[in-house]
């Protein structure tokens, strides 16, 4: 089984790199403000019709545009969910959501989290799914990519005050990247058997003679951008383990590729725009090393399973609880690491049913900020924050002013970097503490002891880091949990974007210094090791005490 696991990981990464390389070249053109071939005329007409000016923006203007678009989307989606019973395409006559669930859901999809305190097939109409959630899947993904575009430009421009035009970037990202690729993926899903219709739910007789109501809906179109944009919110409650969303092993493989496609392509694009492709490869090496180790640990833990099962008469100790038999242990383990390394959160297995160590790895991947490939845009700017921190630490060790890509990293940048890195750990630890201190928080726990605490810690980690997956043994649809998680999602998203944009505004105004004999090379294996060590050190120092009370205690008990 070890050979099968190695072959699965190697095949996945090989296909991923082959697909991401050409996409990275296209993204590099957009970062350099070069229209893609054949799009200039269309862009001119659209910009004119929409009244979009291509005048460049400073970091505050760029940030204001991103925040303004997202706040408008939040308000529209909130009221849409409240009043969905007045809107069309609701064949099941589903009522509007409560204010707290509508707020939680609106914040969730605007922040690219897609945490779901509801069951899609029994709560949301087709209109809410399409015009509400799917639209935000596109816009939240485009927002994250636009932020990393601006951040990359900060390193490649010199003595300037502008970072590009947010509206131009958002339109180009949506029209020329997200929509075409999502369309291709959706058509493939439909061909493989995913649903795409507007029919009422269908009553059928099962082979046992019982009656069953089968949910319908425009699934494939939402499923495609759900994976491509690292959104993760399922059309159905079972998410990607549902055969109507993920009908075959081939669609499952494509879903995993779609999750990592844009984050990987952005690393290639960064290397091209920086004029040194080794810089992009360095980031990919660091991400890939952590990723492969984490996949190996989860596969090992799930294959070892629970030895007590053998004593109880089971044929095998392999942990198949909560997993689709059509996917198996190895694929389920790979998917779990992919979806939590990125900020996706889609699942084909119930993470709550993983072994203690198997469930701890996905939780830890979220807690370190989802910088191992990560979300579209957010993963790369999160990892680049750790790059700045690693450069700063190296500068302290050799007694030189830290610099990266020729830009000196001063006190202002390091303060903002520290702020951005500490936002999500603060939310996670304080949120989990608040939940455990209050009756409203503890009453949602369905399991006692360390596993119950793990469910709470996982939920807050998922929300604060904009992942959206869950240990399902937590009854989170209550005013307390909906409001707590909405706050964590909102601050976890925009509380990081704001200092990232401020860092970009500071760096873009600096001159690029030529490399000297004392310059730390940031493209070799030594720096890859330093970067991995920085990520692991921050994660260990921050979360080991909390993890010791949850999954570690469960493993040892």
Curated annotation (Swiss-Prot):
Keyword Cell membrane part of the UniProt annotation: yes
A single GO molecular function term of this UniProt record: P-type potassium transmembrane transporter activity
Pfam families listed in its UniProt record: KdpA
Keyword tags: Cell inner membrane, Cell membrane, Ion transport, Membrane, Potassium, Potassium transport, Transmembrane, Transmembrane helix, Transport
Membrane topology type: Multi-pass membrane protein
InterPro entries: KdpA
Keyword Disulfide bond: no
GO cellular component, one term: plasma membrane
Cellular localisation: Cell inner membrane
Residues annotated as transmembrane: 5-25, 63-83, 132-152, 170-190, 253-273, 283-303, 329-349, 356-376, 379-399, 416-436, 484-504, 526-546
Subunit organization: The system is composed of three essential subunits: KdpA, KdpB and KdpC.
Family to which the UniProt record says this protein belongs: Belongs to the KdpA family.
Function: Part of the high-affinity ATP-driven potassium transport (or Kdp) system, which catalyzes the hydrolysis of ATP coupled with the electrogenic transport of potassium into the cytoplasm. This subunit binds the periplasmic potassium ions and delivers the ions to the membrane domain of KdpB through an intramembrane tunnel.
Protein name, entry field: Potassium-transporting ATPase potassium-binding subunit
Organism whose genome encodes this protein: Escherichia coli (strain SMS-3-5 / SECEC)
Lineage, opening ranks: Bacteria, Pseudomonadati, Pseudomonadota, Gammaproteobacteria, Enterobacterales
Gene: kdpA
């Amino acid at each position: 089984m070890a050979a099968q696991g190695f072959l699965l990981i190697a095949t996945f990464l090989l296909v991923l790199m082959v697909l991401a390389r050409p996409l990275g070249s296209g993204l590099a053109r957009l970062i350099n403000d070069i229209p893609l071939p054949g799009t200039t005329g269309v862009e001119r007409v659209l910009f004119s019709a929409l009244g979009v000016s291509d005048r460049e923006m400073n970091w505050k203007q760029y940030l204001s545009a991103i925040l303004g678009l997202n706040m408008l989307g939040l308000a529209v989606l909130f009221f849409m969910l409240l009043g969905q019973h007045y809107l069309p395409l609701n064949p099941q006559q589903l009522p509007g959501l409560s204010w707290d669930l509508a707020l939680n859901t609106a914040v969730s999809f605007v922040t690219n989290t897609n945490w779901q305190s509801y069951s899609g097939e029994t709560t949301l109409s087709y209109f809410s799914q399409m015009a509400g959630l799917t639209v935000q899947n596109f816009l939240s993904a485009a927002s994250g990519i636009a932020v990393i575009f601006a951040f990359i430009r900060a390193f490649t421009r010199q003595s300037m005050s502008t970072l590009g035009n947010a509206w131009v970037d958002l339109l180009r990202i949506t029209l020329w990247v997200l929509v075409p690729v999502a369309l291709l993926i959706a058509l493939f899903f439909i061909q493989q058997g995913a649903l795409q219709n507007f029919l009422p739910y269908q009553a059928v007789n099962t082979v046992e003679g019982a009656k069953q109501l089968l949910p319908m809906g425009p699934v494939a179109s939402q499923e495609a951008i759900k994976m491509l944009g690292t959104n993760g919110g399922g059309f159905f409650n079972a998410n990607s383990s549902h055969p109507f969303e993920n009908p075959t092993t081939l669609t499952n493989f494509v879903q995993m590729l779609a999750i990592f496609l844009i984050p990987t392509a952005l690393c290639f694009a960064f290397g091209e725009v920086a004029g040194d492709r080794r810089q992009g490869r360095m980031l990919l090496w660091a991400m890939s090393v952590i990723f492969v180790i984490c996949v190996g640990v989860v596969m090992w833990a799930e294959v070892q399973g629970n030895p007590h099962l053998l004593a109880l008469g089971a044929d095998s100790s392999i942990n198949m609880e909560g997993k689709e038999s059509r996917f198996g242990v190895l694929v389920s383990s790979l998917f779990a690491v992919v979806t939590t390394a990125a900020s996706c959160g889609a699942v084909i297995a119930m993470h709550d049913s993983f072994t203690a160590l198997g469930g701890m790895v996905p939780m830890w991947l979220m807690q370190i900020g989802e910088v191992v490939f990560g979300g579209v845009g957010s993963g790369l700017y999160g990892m680049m924050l750790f790059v700045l921190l690693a450069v700063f630490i190296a500068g302290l060790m050799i007694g030189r002013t830290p610099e990266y890509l020729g830009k000196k990293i001063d006190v202002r940048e390091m303060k903002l970097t520290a702020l951005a890195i500490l936002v999500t750990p603060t939310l996670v630890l304080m949120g989990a503490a608040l939940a455990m201190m209050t009756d409203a928080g503890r009453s949602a726990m369905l399991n006692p002891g360390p596993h119950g605490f793990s469910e709470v810690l996982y939920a807050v980690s998922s929300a604060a880091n904009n992942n959206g997956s869950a240990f399902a043994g937590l009854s989170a649809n209550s005013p307390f949990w909906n409001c707590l998680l909405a706050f964590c999602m909102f601050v976890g998203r925009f509380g990081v974007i704001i200092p990232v944009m401020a860092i970009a505004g500071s760096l873009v105004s600096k001159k690029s210094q030529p490399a000297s004999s004392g310059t730390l090379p940031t493209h070799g294996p030594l720096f890859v090791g330093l970067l991995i060590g920085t990520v692991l050190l921050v994660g260990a120092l921050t979360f080991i005490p909390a993890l010791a009370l949850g999954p570690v205690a469960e493993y040892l008990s």
